[in-house]
Amino acid sequence: MLLALLFVAPSCGRSSLTLGATDVEALIKIGIIADSYGEMTLGVDPWEVVVCHIPIFTSDEIFEPSLERMSLSSREIVKRLSPVVSYFKRHSYGRYQPLFSAGQDVTISDTETSDDCAERALDQSGPEVRGVMVVADAEHGADEFGGRGTPGVGCSESCSARDTRRSVYAGAGDFMDYWNGDSPLDLVEHEIGHALDWPHSTTLASNSGLELYDSPLDVMSDSSAPRMLISTKRHGPGTLAINLYAARWFDDEHLQILDRSRRVNTKVQLLATDIDLSIMGTRFVVIADGANSFLTVELIAARGDNAHLNSAAVAIHRITVAGTSGVDRQQTVVEKDMQDGDKWAGNGISIEVLFIDSDDGDVKAEIEMTVKKTVTS
């Protein structure tokens, strides 16, 4: 049978598991890490947008050698970010809303780097600002990263960006004049994901070293996948169920854990992860797969921000908890496009998709899972 999560009274916004089983130890760690960052994923999140002016003859090799510079002001960038607000309200089911305001420009010298852009903007931010978004007015080189984001250090009460160093940084590429006012926003959404303490997902077995940003299922992987297929798209894909849970956008009743204390064979109905939370039902299943890792099984609908996908599909990811923050988690694609009749098996676990169906927009699936009893010594 499937065991729903049992919880005690909330502490710092996150409940504590009381199953008493080592099966869910890694999931407990995710909750503890999320608690350490306070309420940054809930409610209105004030961000200050700052333009960083880069000298023409900068020594920072991340920038493309060019005389061309972005013409937008921080106020104009704030206007461009309006769809980003809608993106996060949509995927948080109204539980989270970034609030962007224009900050004072900063300038670096020709011997300073893009890191100094963020540090200078953080140092000047006010106590009410919980995150700083810095946009350089110069483009990055074609082989360089587009941006970066960090949740900063944990906090419980005073969570000002000046204290936590929570920030997002991006080069000018997505805000240059050649976009004619229609900027792609997936990079910004990806970096805000990092500032919400979300890690990358990838098909590689480890998130250390070189990574492939190759999963079209997750804004934290191939964030440009939608517009690569549909040129008018500007948002990234949605994100994985485990990120939504860590952010407290999924509740405990949306998660079920498969009991590995004995042999189990069960059928589970899944609702697509984008279905409104007013409709009750399981959004994802967790199956322990080692001391610090587990599998997640979820149903992703091919619509909205995921309209680039061929069809609704069941996806399996291996989540490995590492380090002391969520961005250290390893989230590896196991299966990304399971359809009717598809099966996966490994480590005493087998998963079969019995059917995927759509009824009046409610995309749902039935899966059958068999799990052998975990042997402990």
Segment roles from a protein language model:
Residues 139-305:
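Extracellular hydrolytic enzyme modules, especially secreted metalloproteases
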Residues 10-12:
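N-terminal Sec signal peptide cleavage junction
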Residues 62-79, 229-243, 309-311, 329-332:
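Short, polar loop/linker segments at the starts of domains and inter-domain junctions
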Residues 87-89, 245-250, 351:
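Short, Φ-rich (hydrophobic/aromatic) sequence segments
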Residues 19-32, 41, 55, 61-63, ...:
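Non-catalytic C-terminal accessory/binding modules of secreted extracellular proteins
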Residues 46-48, 131, 216-217, 294, ...:
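A residue-level signal for beta-strand positions that form part of recognition/binding surfaces
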Residues 17-183:
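Zn2+-dependent metallopeptidase catalytic core
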Residues 1-8:
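Bacterial N-terminal signal peptides
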